[in-house]
């Protein structure tokens, strides 16, 4: 990844040569052979499990981590890492500085309350990015055109809906009326009833039974954690010391988070390299007596490809294990399309739970998702502490205690406002746009405009809202970088390299969206093909190019410092990352203690 790799290797090799100079050759050879054997066996289920029971990292990652643990203690290596990471991450600090240019950031809560007008002024920038003025308001018009205050519809999966003004005003009123309510208490029976209604609506959408159970959560990650925690707790109750969560390698990273939080072992199953979906026969070989749950995506975040849910359901029934379908991304899209020929919900025998995000294609406010359990689910996500000295304590769900009833009310209001017919209309328009993009891409490579299907192609056979792009002749990340120069904000993928475009209702309202995207894509690929040999990566391309060979400790440290920069307005522009230090510098102390005017800081961020 970084320019310091060669310096790091030089320092490490020099120290290693000195360390091993008196070691017999046969010991070095045998040690190297052992490492090689272990590295090549990391995909073997039986060997992998022995290591994964002690660490969720793959064998490859464990070798990298071990090498890093040794290397960072060698003379000079720490200084190289510290110096180069500060240099490489300076671009992050610079981006934050530019993003926050002109903002007034306060270090403390104001002594006296501010007026509503002053408070609202702090939101002006982000509100503008969600503001849309439509030129064509006739829903029957074939034309798609709008003016955007904060962009031109070139963001992938960032904004899923544009609420009509009357819905926006309704949500304001609903929030104001319910913000202080709490579904955990029976003081607000209507809020509790609304929550029950929302769960029933969602159960019906996914063809669940009246006896099904469900939770309204804060997002897809929370829904996944709730489901996985329920299954892990059940497994431990059955006497399984090392519960295993078996997922396709394309499953969302939230499953890894769930495994780490619950102390479970995450078992990743390779997917078919041609289709991008997991093969049930292959997954079967990874199921053991320790399996707490198996998982399938409908579809996956990476390439929009859904796993064979029906076949996985049969496998789950045969092996007598729970089966979770992750429909966080596309659940409220596919629920309004005809999937009777290939169901991906509770119609499939063996499916015991589903996660689906309301805040994506359900068009609900951000921070809303559902975790649904079938009538036959062997585990439910509930928590109870009945012998607590503070009284009886029980919550629907393992994570949440008190929550705002406004979340329930706003979901209720949004679903009620749109209605099934509107959701179906939105879903069909997204599929229509995806087909149009694929059609134009096919025409592009068939017309011989200097490009072939080897230069750029859609991976697998995505059927929903995501198109994953790859190239056999170019670095796909370079292509995405060129598209970014043309205003596109796409999601980079890795292992293997690629990028995806996640289509939303917003994109369907842009006249000529597919033509503009294909035009820019063609230009981007041609530009990359004309790159001089040996062109060096930069920015996100450089980061993605190295993360696969980066120790987990270093990955987490970089992420920690990045999040620290985002949440601390002094950390984004001052001082070093402090990766190998534990206390702030005098300069940092001075910045933190400094106050300007009435506790306001006109920062350059």
Curated annotation (Swiss-Prot):
UniProt cross-references to InterPro entries, sorted A to Z: GrpII_AminoAcid_Decarb, PyrdxlP-dep_de-COase, PyrdxlP-dep_Trfase, PyrdxlP-dep_Trfase_major, PyrdxlP-dep_Trfase_small
Pfam family, one: Pyridoxal_deC
Cofactor(s) recorded in Swiss-Prot or TrEMBL: pyridoxal 5'-phosphate
BP GO terms, sorted: carboxylic acid metabolic process; sphingolipid catabolic process
Organism superkingdom: Bacteria
GO molecular function: carboxy-lyase activity; pyridoxal phosphate binding; sphinganine-1-phosphate aldolase activity
GO cellular component: membrane
Task performed by this protein: Cleaves phosphorylated sphingoid bases (PSBs), such as sphingosine-1-phosphate, into fatty aldehydes and phosphoethanolamine. Possibly implicated in influencing the macrophage autophagy pathway.
Name of the molecule in the record: Probable sphingosine-1-phosphate lyase
Species, as recorded: Legionella pneumophila (strain Lens)
């Amino acid at each position: 990844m970084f320019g310091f790799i060669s310096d790091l290797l030089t320092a490490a090799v020099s120290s290693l040569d000195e360390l091993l100079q008196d070691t017999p050759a046969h010991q070095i050879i045998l040690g190297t052979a052992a490492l090689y054997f272990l590295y090549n066996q990391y995909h073997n289920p039986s060997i992998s499990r022995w290591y994964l029971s002690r660490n969720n990292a793959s064998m490859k990652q464990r070798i990298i981590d071990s090498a890093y643990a040794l290397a960072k203690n060698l003379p000079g290596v720490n200084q190289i890492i510290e110096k180069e990471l500060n240099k490489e991450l300076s671009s992050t600090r610079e981006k934050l500085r530019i993003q926050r240019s002109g903002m007034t950031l306060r270090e403390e809560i104001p002594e006296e309350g501010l007026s509503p007008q002053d408070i609202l002024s702090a939101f002006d920038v982000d509100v503008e990015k969600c503001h849309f003025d439509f030129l064509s308001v006739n829903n029957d018009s074939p034309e798609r055109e709008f003016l955007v205050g904060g962009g031109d519809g070139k963001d992938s999966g960032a904004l899923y809906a544009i609420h009509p003004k009357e819905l926006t005003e309704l949500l304001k009123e609903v929030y104001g009326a319910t913000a202080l309510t709490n579904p955990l208490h029976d003081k607000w029976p209507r809020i509790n009833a609304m929550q029950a209604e929302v769960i029933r609506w969602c159960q019906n959408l996914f063809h669940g039974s009246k006896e099904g159970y469900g939770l309204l959560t804060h997002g897809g990650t929370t829904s996944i954690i709730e489901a996985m925690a329920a299954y892990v707790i059940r497994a431990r109750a059955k006497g399984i010391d090392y519960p295993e969560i078996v997922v396709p390698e394309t499953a969302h990273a939230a499953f890894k988070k769930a495994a780490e939080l619950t102390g479970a072992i995450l078992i990743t199953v390779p997917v078919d390299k041609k289709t991008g979906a997991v093969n049930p026969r292959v997954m079967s070989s990874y199921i053991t007596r320790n399996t707490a749950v198996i998982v399938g995506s409908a579809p996956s975040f990476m390439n929009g490809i859904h796993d064979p849910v029906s076949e996985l359901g049969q496998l789950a029934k045969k092996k007598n294990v729970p089966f979770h379908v992750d429909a966080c991304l596309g659940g409220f899209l596919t629920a309004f399309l005809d999937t009777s020929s290939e169901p991906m919900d509770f119609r499939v025998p063996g499916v015991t739970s589903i996660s689906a995000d309301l805040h994506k294609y359900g068009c609900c406010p951000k921070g809303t998702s559902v975790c649904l359990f079938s009538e036959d689910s062997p585990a439910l996500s509930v928590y109870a502490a009945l012998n607590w000295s503070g009284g009886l304590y029980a919550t629907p769900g393992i994570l949440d205690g008190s929550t705002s009833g406004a979340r329930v009310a706003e979901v209720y209001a949004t679903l009620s406002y749109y209605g099934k017919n509107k959701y179906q209309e939105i879903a069909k328009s997204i599929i229509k746009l995806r087909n149009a993009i694929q059609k134009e891409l096919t025409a592009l490579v068939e017309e011989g405009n200097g490009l072939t299907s080897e230069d750029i192609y859609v991976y697998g056979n995505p059927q929903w809202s995501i198109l994953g792009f790859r190239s056999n002749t170019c670095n796909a990340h370079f292509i995405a970088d060129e598209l970014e120069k043309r205003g596109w904000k796409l999601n980079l993928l890795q292992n293997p390299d690629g990028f995806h475009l996640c289509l939303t209702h917003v994109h369907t309202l842009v006249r000529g969206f597919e033509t503009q995207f294909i035009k820019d894509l063609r230009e981007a690929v041609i530009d990359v093909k004309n790159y001089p040999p040996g062109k060096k990566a930069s920015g996100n391309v450089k980061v993605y190019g190295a993360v696969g060979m980066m120790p987990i400790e270093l990955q987490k440290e970089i992420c920690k410092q990045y999040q620290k920069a985002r949440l601390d307005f002094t950390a984004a522009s001052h001082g070093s990352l402090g990766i190998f230090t534990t206390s702030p510098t005098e300069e940092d102390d001075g910045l933190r203690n400094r106050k300007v005017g009435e506790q306001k800081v006109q920062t350059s961020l």
